[in-house]
Amino acid sequence: MIEIKNLTKFYGKGESCFKALDDVSVCINDGEFVVILGASGSGKSTFLNVISGLETIDGGSVVYDSEQLENMSEKELTIFRRDNTAYIFQQYYLLPHLTVEKNIKMGADLDNNKDFFPLIEAVGLSEKRKKFPSELSGGEQQRVAIARALAKNPKVLFLDEPTGALDENTGRLVLDYIIKLQEKQRFTMIMVTHNANIAETADRVIKMNSGKIVGITENTDKKTVYEIGW
């Protein structure tokens, strides 16, 4: 379980100080798929970055089971993120000198004996697995980043608009694969999106505005990506 209590985040100093997160509290259960909705500037991406340990906590706490992020040293936090989490953000951060296949293997804790072909095939890159990032389109590079994160078999997967660079059909296929994998492996998945339709596939939906949680909805009738359309 991830327990978030009275979480606060500031940007800037003095008169330019801005409260991006304002006393946010929520618990996220193990194996749960949570979608975070909100307009631009609502604090949803900041919330994701802080609870994932990518940004510092200015007030409150984030507790994974019994481990508090705010009490960890930089080294401890790096090890914790490496061993427990994976990220799919809008930036790709691919290694330009490695092929598609090797970039994906980089996410798997050096377990290079594992068969990654089913994963590569699922994101539609089987014919380009020997290509380099410079030979791929932006959407194809995003699919490599998605596969690399999934190759880690994370306990918690964080996603920030993961299919934003993909065309509608490819985005639907990739997202459907991610959701089905989450349901099978039961890792915790927390996704920021502007797409209210995608929220219908989640266990819970958190709505944010002005750095605060303004609503939490449970989905009693979860749908698949193919059922909802985009």
Give the label of every model feature segment:
Residues I2-A202, K207-M208:
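ABC family nucleotide-binding domain
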Residues K212-W230:
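Conserved beta-strand-loop-alpha-helix hinge in the C-terminal portion
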